Regions:
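N-terminal signal peptide c-region/cleavage motif recognized by signal peptidases
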Residues: 15-18
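Sec-dependent signal peptide recognition
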Residues: 2-9
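Low-complexity, acidic/polar, glycine-enriched regions of mature
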Residues: 20-183
Length: 183
C-alpha cells in the first residue's frame, strides 16, 4: 500500500512540476510610440523597428521570469509621425546622422505589483540620463504583454522643442512601449 501511495505521489509531483516548467517566450510584436504636444497639434509618432535584447524570455507558474537585463534600441530612420517634413525635422533635432538611434539599457529590474520596476539609462541625441518606469505585465490568449510609459523633457537631452507659427511644443515627450511575447 505504501508503495502504491509513493508511486501515485511521485506521479502527481511530476505532473504538477511539469506544469511549472519554464517555456520559452519569443518577442512577436514590438511597439515604441512617442507623443509631443504643440499648441496647434498633438503629434503621435511610432518607431517601426525596435531591437530588443534578449529576444527570448522564460515563463513559469508566476508568469514571465525576471530578465537580468534588457537593452532596447530604436533606429532613428524608423521614426514616423505621419508627415515626412516633420520626420526629417525630428531626425535633425535628434542629431541624425551622427546619432543613429535612441537606446535604453537597464541597470536594475525589480518585481512590483503587476509588473516590473525598471531603472536604466536612456540615450537620446548623444545624451544619457537615468530613467525609471513601471512595466505592466498582462496575459491574454496565451500571449504576454509587457507595456508602460514614461515622460522625458527635451531640454534634458539637449533638444530644442520644435516651433510652428512662433509657438513652441511642450517640453515633455511621452514615450510608450508595448512588447508581445508568445510561446
Amino acid at each position: 500500500m505504501n508503495r502504491i501511495f509513493g508511486i501515485v505521489s511521485l506521479f502527481l509531483l511530476l505532473s504538477f512540476s511539469s506544469n511549472l516548467s519554464s517555456e520559452d517566450l519569443k518577442l512577436s510584436q514590438k511597439t515604441l510610440k512617442f507623443t509631443v504636444i504643440h499648441p496647434f497639434k498633438t503629434v503621435h509618432g511610432v518607431c517601426g523597428e525596435v531591437n530588443i535584447t534578449p529576444t527570448t524570455f522564460s515563463s513559469g507558474a508566476n508568469g514571465v521570469q525576471l530578465p537580468k537585463a534588457v537593452k532596447i534600441e530604436a533606429p532613428l530612420k524608423e521614426f514616423r509621425s505621419g508627415d515626412e517634413n516633420r520626420d526629417s525635422h525630428i531626425l535633425e533635432s535628434l542629431g541624425f546622422p551622427e546619432n543613429q538611434s535612441v537606446s535604453f539599457s537597464s541597470t536594475s529590474i525589480d518585481i512590483t505589483d503587476g509588473g516590473w520596476l525598471v531603472s536604466g539609462n536612456l540615450t537620446i541625441n548623444g545624451v544619457t540620463k537615468p530613467v525609471k518606469t513601471k512595466a505592466n505585465i498582462s496575459s491574454n490568449n496565451g500571449q504576454i504583454e509587457v507595456s508602460g510609459k514614461f515622460q522625458i523633457k527635451m531640454g534634458d537631452y539637449q533638444i530644442t522643442p520644435p516651433s510652428l507659427l512662433f509657438a513652441k511644443a511642450k517640453e515633455e515627450v511621452e514615450i510608450e512601449f508595448s512588447f508581445i511575447l508568445k510561446p
